[in-house]
Amino acid sequence: MVRYNRDKFVGEKYEVLVVTEADVELSSVICVSIGRGRHKQVIAEHRHLVEQGARLVEMRLDYIRRNVTLQRLLKDRPSPVVMTCRRQQDGGKWEGTEENRIILLRAAIVAGVDYIDLE
């Protein structure tokens, strides 16, 4: 598992923390993926999934049709969130440039997302 340490910014990059099995208590958590075209649909489904018992959700940023507003997606979130933005070559819907995809994911880190998933 890889986590970014938001508290330690080195140059233009965040320090990357690599967590091994020896560092954490092993347990299983199912992460439910949300791929919807509108922010309000993602937010509503996130709330619904948590009400049904989900403990972790993945928000697929590549499904959102308009400009992604990270603060809106992360505000008052009812559970930890994994954000990802899949390229088409990885089975996703991202049509922008690779540079813009990385900028979006870095912005998610700055906005306080719990986890980032990269292919």
Q: Which residues make up each language-model segment?
A:
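A common structural microfeature
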Residues: V29, A54-E58, P80-V82
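Short, small-residue-enriched loops and turns at beta-alpha junctions
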Residues: G37-K40, Y63-R66, Q88-G96
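N-terminal-biased segments
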Residues: V2-V10, V50-V68
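Short, acidic/polar
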Residues: G37-V50, G96-A107
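Catalytic beta/alpha-barrel core
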Residues: S33-G35, L56-I64, L105, A111-E119
